[in-house]
Amino acid sequence: MAVIDRHRASVLFIDMQERLVPEVESGNLVASMCERLMAWLSDQQAAVVVTEHCAAKLGNTVFEVPKTAMRVDKTAFSAIKEHSVQVIAPQQQVIVCGMESHLCVFQTVMDLLEAQKQVFVVTDLVASRDPIDKMAALARMQAAGAMIVTIEMVLFEWVRNTSDASFGSMLQLVKRLRQIKATNS
């Protein structure tokens, strides 16, 4: 088991698109939290990949994607079957967020594990239309070797120390994410 190392990690945001988000349980909550995480990661100069599955049919990502992020339109369910592998390839660790847990997220995680990556699935930043699908997907991904984490685990592991220059902004993000969760519960 490993702790997230920001120098060896990339973050993958899967298919948070206009026609999909409203159909998924807690889709708007997940998208809102992902939007804030992505903005913070952009300030951290993190390796970020955003995928859109059949964008012509499902629409674009529901929030602004920073120019520094790699944006990939895909048709395969697995996000690494297409161009996003270019950014992910040099990174040993991949943090995964997105939709749907049992479809594109699941197949991506399985392919990442097969490629010998350390995979961290952010349980409060993945979603499916039916909660049973999310639950089953998380169980299978964990059994296959993925580490199931929360957004707070990701952030505190990313920073690791109160003396880190990004600690203050990370703590503000944690507080904001807690407010968002409380408002939507």
Where are these regions (language model features)?
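Active-site-adjacent betaalpha module
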Residues: A2-S10, D43-Q44, A56-S185
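Short connector loops/turns at beta-strand edges and beta->alpha or beta->beta junctions
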Residues: M16-R19, A115
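N-terminal nucleotide-binding beta1-loop-alpha1 segment
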Residues: S10-M16
